[in-house]
UniProtKB/Swiss-Prot annotation:
Residues 47-48, 159-169 are annotated as: Interaction with the K-D-E-L motif on target proteins. The chain crosses the membrane at residues 5-24, 33-52, 59-79, 93-110, 117-135, 150-168, 179-199. InterPro entries: ER_ret_rcpt (IPR000133). PANTHER family: ER LUMEN PROTEIN RETAINING RECEPTOR. Its main location: endoplasmic reticulum. GO terms for molecular function: ER retention sequence binding; KDEL sequence binding. This is ER lumen protein-retaining receptor 2. It is a multi-pass membrane protein. Receptor for the C-terminal sequence motif K-D-E-L that is present on endoplasmic reticulum resident proteins and that mediates their recycling from the Golgi back to the endoplasmic reticulum. Binding is pH dependent, and is optimal at pH 5-5.4. Belongs to the ERD2 family. It comes from Danio rerio. It is found in: Endoplasmic reticulum membrane; Golgi apparatus membrane; Cytoplasmic vesicle, COPI-coated vesicle membrane. The record marks 193 as: Important for recycling of cargo proteins with the sequence motif K-D-E-L from the Golgi to the endoplasmic reticulum. One of its GO terms (cellular component) is membrane.
Amino acid sequence: MNIFRLTGDLSHLAAIIILLLKIWKSRSCAGISGKSQILFALVFTTRYLDLLTSFISLYNTCMKVIYIGCAYATVYLIYAKFRATYDGNHDTFRAEFLVVPVGGLAFLVNHDFSPLEILWTFSIYLESVAILPQLFMISKTGEAETITTHYLFCLGVYRALYLFNWIWRFYFEGFFDMIAIVAGVVQTILYCDFFYLYVTKVLKGKKLSLPA
């Protein structure tokens, strides 16, 4: 494992912990897109089905279990425990417009036409756009809480670091996965505007708000 993957995993884990703590400590899921969290739960479920068929390492297994468990815990907090605070009026992105095309693409473009491989490919494609409902929600409300922006920043850093991980693996291991790289580039591009606002506003102590 190289440093880019390790720090990417830690950044991803930090994002998940930040989100869970934000919801639990504030007893509110205001400003959080439940639809994005459902999509992430679907991403981890379809990607890590290999937990049932193979063992790579203790680290790998633990991280997969943590991701799946935290994803469903987040969905539970939003749609059950703190449902009264969920802002469904602004969380209106049509998630099916992401899931259906991504599902079709996974069938057409994959490494191997087998159930597990198609589901893994589906998860890679879906993860690249799963944050769109959250970004759409922020665009509708015009602002985001600081802790929510920290969560999004850590997610963006995780994906950017994974791009460097693929570059490292190509040069030092001769490993190249076009599907993962293209999806990672798409996901990183989606965060670009947010990164700019994060650096110019949030890091300077200002609240992230979008122009009217």
